[in-house]
Amino acid sequence: MNEELNDARRDFLKVAAALPAVAVAPWAIAQGPVVAAGPASAPDIAPVDRVFITNEDSNTISVINPMSNAVDTTINLTSFDEDARPPFRFVTGGVMPTHAAMIHKPLYHGCIDAHGAVPNPDGTLLATSGRGSSNIYLIDAVNRRVLGNAANPQAGTTTNPERLSSGILLGREPHEPAFTRNGKELWVTLRGEDRIAILDVGQALKQVGGVPSNAVRAYVPTLNGPAQVWFSKDGKLAFVISQKVAQLEILEVNPDANGHSRPRRLRLVDLGTQDKPAFTPFQKLSPDGTQMWLSHKLADAVSVVSVKDPGTVLATLALGEMARPNHLEFVDNPRGQVTYMSLARVDDGGPNAAASSRLAIIDRSVPLAQQKVVGMVYTGGREAHGLWTNPANNLLYVAHEQDELPGTPNAGQVVCSAFDVSTPLQPKLITQIPLGSLKLPSGELRNKKSINLVYVRPGTKGQTA
């Protein structure tokens, strides 16, 4: 087994070495001067902009202010310290539980495995999924708080001022939520089942607010192990990927006069050639709305699927052995058009001579038949996962799952990396942002294992509009 892994590692490094100069010394190139194309514009940051990151092991959401590139809020999705008695505390008798053990403490009713996150079309509302707790939470993106929390009758100096909402229970393994383009519904893939929960957003807001409501409009049968839904630009089609079968399902949204869906299957696509391991966790629509890009994590590839001819696979691009792609993001600006793929694998030789993951860079300015990985850049963190750009497409944030190693500047911390992508083919690291801890009355809960990341400008139409 070790020999196989070493062979795969060598194969990956051979691929990286064979790439153009931008990939040969990715960290050095990323730090180097940009091409002579005039002065790069400053990152477009509005005062309301925030980066939201779900932390799966700590069940928290880190909120970064891109103006300062520091965490300004940590949203608490745990139920610790709502009561001063020991069974309700995070730290009991001076003993701090491990992240894995903390959710098994008696009377815990908080989130388990905070994972998915997505903004609604105008960026004022976020939906976050708890994989293990089988629910979703709604987050006020303007005030950065959980909707539905109640005043804690036992609030005091040793307890929290609020009791955590239960969110909305849906089913086993809710993975990724997605708002419809009109913002009226929230579709949540239940990865532990073979169905999608469809919520009426208006009713969901009432339900978490304590008004008796039936937020779930329907459960729609779909592929086994559905991982994510993403909608076409016109909102008429829903693309459904799976982490259990090598298939892509395309549904017609078929909205009624009130904008509520009446889904029906349009096509079922066999991806056995493109994704033999049958493990596609993430997808995203290209900026022009013509292509859906699918990340095949265990196949170490990304497929490009037509939206005009729904489901037709236009290309599949190899990313290198053991690359293990997670999420993807598009950056289109006057200096270039690229797709960035976050790679989970970790290699030596990153910033500060520390181990780091990489971003694969695919040049999309050339015809599709010529598109391929043209470079890689170290992310400055370990096991890169979620990534998202600002509205101007000149700033990029990348989340990481693993803690930084001993002897590094942010040892023991999970970090988010900020990049200047004003020249898309030459992303440059701005800074590593340690996510720190949630300060609970009984002790500090370290933010750990970042998964999804979204960049939000409340009140402005974003990528889900």
Where do the language-model regions lie?
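Short loop/turn segments immediately following beta-strands, especially the blade-tip
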Residues: 68, 141-147, 200-209, 251-260, ...
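Short, conserved, GDST-rich strand-edge loop motifs in beta-rich repeat architectures
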Residues: 38, 43-45, 342-354, 399-413
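C-terminal segment of N-terminal export signals and the immediately downstream linker at the start
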Residues: 27-58, 71
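N-terminal secretory signal peptides
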Residues: 1-11, 15-26
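Short glycine/acidic-enriched loop and turn motifs that connect beta-strands
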Residues: 58-59, 133-134, 193-194, 245-246, ...
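A short beta-strand motif characteristic of beta-propeller blades
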Residues: 73-75, 101-107, 148-150, 162-167, ...
